[in-house]
Amino acid sequence: MQEIGILENLQKSLSLKESMLSYEMLGKSLSYNPYLPRVIPQIKDCVFVTPDEVLGKLLEENTRTECVIVNFKGLYEIGAPSVFDLEVLGLLRRHASSLIVHQDLFISHYQLLESLVQGSDGVILDEELLKEDLKGMAEFAWRLGLSVFVETHKPDYTHLKDLGVLGVLEKVPHSQNQKKIVFLD
């Protein structure tokens, strides 16, 4: 039941954004974007945060880390997120040298383009949510220059290597972050 509400909130948020700024205009805004996606090497130091924690944890404390993974998924549990919520990615990009990976409920090319415009270096796609659309979304993200990671519950990652996925998000039960990035060779 909660899953249906989350997807409805996602659709509302996406519809509102697209009504304010069309896909074509969002694409054209890339020509004014000062932040090209950076290549993500096999990093060891990742911090997982929510959008609210970016201001308090990272910018105010000036935390130094190789990579920041900003998880927007929780925003859909409480309603349709604000159209301005992704601006935290741009703020982080301007004020921190860390690589930025955007984790969200990605279901459209519009969202991937928006992530790039806001300053992300990579995205985490949810295999369970996308199912057969995973390949198309991964290919589009790669064409944009974004590094692609996948959240999966499958123990075998062979099929993901064929898609050009850089790594997977794994659950780690007794760690501070509860998750970690595992790079595919």
Model regions and ranges:
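Short beta-strand elements of ligand-binding domains
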Residues: 101-104, 126, 150-152, 182-185
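Hydrophobic, well-structured mid-protein blocks that either form specific transmembrane helices
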Residues: 97-102, 106-144
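Glycine-rich phosphate-binding active-site loops on the catalytic face of alpha/beta enzymes
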Residues: 69-74, 117-133, 167-176, 183-185
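Conserved N-terminal beta1-alpha1 strand-loop-helix module at the mouth
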Residues: 1-100, 109-110, 144-150, 154-166, ...
